UniProtKB/Swiss-Prot annotation:
Record Pfam families: Ribosomal_L30
Keywords assigned: Ribonucleoprotein, Ribosomal protein
Native species: Photorhabdus laumondii subsp. laumondii (strain DSM 15139 / CIP 105565 / TT01) (Photorhabdus luminescens subsp. laumondii)
Family stated for the protein in its record: Belongs to the universal ribosomal protein uL30 family.
GO BP terms in the entry: translation
A GO term for molecular function: structural constituent of ribosome
Entry keyword Ribosomal protein: yes
Record's protein name: Large ribosomal subunit protein uL30
Length: 59
């Protein structure tokens, strides 16, 4: 089984760059406090790095 990570949105996407909003949607995050579990892949890590100021990551 692949390793997973928990990603939680901690800041609003209002007023952010459209690319950053799209990245949150790609991660499956919809609102502040929403948590999703994603596979730990380089693609997901890249998405998290792009919006690192809006999300919290738990290994």
């Amino acid at each position: 089984m692949a390793k997973t990570i928990k990603v939680t949105q901690i800041r609003s996407s209002i007023g952010r760059l459209p690319k950053h909003k799209a990245t949150l949607v790609g991660l499956g995050l919809r609102r502040i406090g929403h948590t999703v579990e994603r596979e730990d892949t380089p693609a997901i890590r890249g998405m998290i790095n792009l919006v690192s100021y809006m999300v919290k990551v738990e290994e």
